[in-house]
Amino acid sequence: RIVEQVERSTLLLHIPADALRQETLYATGGSALMANYDFRRYDVQAQGGKYRHSQTLTAELGANFHQWIVRSGQSYTTFDGEARFSHLYRYAQRSFSGRDAVLQVGEIVTGDALFPGITLTGVQMLPEHAASDRLSLTVSLPRAGSAEVWQGKILLKSYQVSAGINRLGGLPALSQQDDFTLVTFDESGNRQQQNIPRLQAQPESALPESGSAFAAGRLRLSRERAPLMLASTGLLQTQRIALRAGGLAGEGYLAAAWQARLRLAGKLTASLSQIVAQTGGKKLGATHQAALSYPLDQQLSLTTSASWRSRGYRTIDSGWRADGEESGDAQIRSQLAAGVSLNRAALGLFSLTASDTQSWRGNHTRGYTLAWSRTFARVNLNLGVQKNRLTVARQQHEDRYAYLNFSLPLGRDSNLRGWMTRNNGAMRMGAGYDQTVSPAFAWSLSSEQSAQQAPLLASSASWSSKYSQLSGGVARSATGSRFSFGARGGAVVHSEGVTFTPHSVGDTFSIISLHRAQPDVEIRTPAGTVWSDRHGYAIASLTPWRKNSVQINPHSLPGNVQIPGGIAELTPFRGAAVPLDLPAWRVRRALLTFPPEERPEPGSAVENSRGALVAYVSEDGTLFIDDLPAGPLYAHRPGGARCAIALTTPWVDRPGSLYTLLSARCVI
């Protein structure tokens, strides 16, 4: 039923509640090939003539079709001519929205709540919200630059990082035993290395509390490639408690597990779990885990966890490293971890993570990372402290690292910064100047000195185009020179050609078409700003199952081009390569002037030959038309006589011009 409210210029629609659509319509469809890349090269030329160089490349190849996701990840590294290629993963994935489940086939990592993190070649079915097997690390860095995360001898992923607290996400971890190695390069070319305990990595998706999970296949990193099968399911789910149980069976290995998650008070939750395993039909062992979580609000969260293992307990993949070599350090005795995050306007941003791991062989790893950031007036301060101690065979190896830096804005697009770092007793300090020339280009100049090294002068620049993100730097001192270069981005092959993007392509994305060869149109997407290529296409990575907004920046359009609306919202199905049309139209805006004796009446309506309204004559007797039609136009002269508008100046197309000034007559 429709009710018209004339006085309010409103129509009221009365619709029965049962006629409203309850199910969300997800954007689906599309097929495409994709690729992501991140390339880095570093060169060092010593004063005496010695030359060293290294290169790293991480790449992801894949395809999206009918909501299937196919991905393959690999990394390639060289150091002074010695090369290493590492295969990280290869899998296919499909979500089933009606069942809230996802199927993965190939080289996968189990996402089961009771037996997570097992790398295998096989198949698994698990709840949709637990589909991501990636990890994230929170690190604190003194200067902007690039970072590499390694596990064993394998490069997992590269990042562009800023000074202060950084979250390094999307890590495809290969082992539950190996710690991570973080290698950073600042804009001066300085290389620093830190060891980060594996325990400090956080999963990017929540492990399932309800629903069922199943996995079967063969271990991927052990030499025997032993077969295994595991399953778990939720037994009880209430507002106060969630109970889950499951089991795992492999060649010479059996395990049973349970887990309980309890809501103690408000947002304070606890979890208890136990796994009992039998190895070789004889050895029996158990592990016990307990955790507390208190996410008070978006500004404060507390977490702590602890686990203890009996001497006879083994995981099914114990004893094997990420690079396939046998490890003797897998007999973990206990693991403790704690973290606190605080964000208050008066105190700033504070983060602390700590971990402690002991093995039955007497090995001991202990570490913590503290970071603090606060803005005083216009000055931003960052403080970071990190310490890691490794004890093996009664021999200790300790890494200590601390830094303090500041940043002072000098205007809208420039700032002055300074820093001081101390790494295992070596002190360095320096200052720099940053200038952002445009949203796509920035450069910096810095100087650094230390007691151990000669003063260093460095410069770097970064450029983000519609095709790729490029960066480079050069540094020089009395002892030699350093050079660096980087390129990162993605590409999508679709039915209309190849489209490059400066951002990595996610598992769900949209292929934006402007329906004409209109380059350099700025488009704001959930993953960042992109620009249309010379064919009028761009790629936008999307978040599945959520509403995503894609918006044209109208200021980036030429004056004679418009995109009606200029904004689109869509909720995509995971794995969709959604075609998104935002058609751009070239318009003929014109300002018509008339001689006094042949001028239409001010306020007169201007119509086409079909009688449709086109515009109104202005009070000064001029006529502005947003899109000048090709056919005849008619108006009225003073006195009411109908007249035809005839151009005395021919139309000339001027690309980029907002409008064209024309002379005309209104002829009776």
State the predicted function of each range.
Residues 253-257:
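Feature captures the catalytic cores and cofactor-binding loops of soluble hydro-lyases/lyases
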